[in-house]
Amino acid sequence: MREIVWRPRAVADVDGILSYIVLEYRSPKAAQSCADAISQAVERVAELPETGRLFADDDLERTYRRVLAKNYWIYYSYDADTITVWRVFHTSQDHDTYGFALLEE
């Protein structure tokens, strides 16, 4: 299995998602379920990274892949040794509005 590297922005995304679930729905159990689903999805793509859907954007220099975990898209790239998780978005979010074009930073 490849090493999993979480970019700071992806960590902040997940922290925000889990905080929102706890505060909005008052459900730590639902937040834990979401965290588990995201973690399991990342572990699966670390084993088989080609399973994620290709995602290319004209504004981005590299091609990314994405995988769905519950209602969240996880955007990642990979090489022979590493999976890099770049962002995690709710499916209803406008990715351009939320800085997807700034992944390279």
Question: Predicted regions span which residues?
Answer:
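Basic, Lys/Arg-enriched alpha-helical interface segments
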Residues: R2-L60, D96-Y98, E104-E105
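Basic/aromatic recognition patch in beta-strand/loop cores that engages polyanionic ligands
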Residues: E50-T82
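Enriched for short, Lys/Arg-rich terminal
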Residues: A69-W73, S77-E105
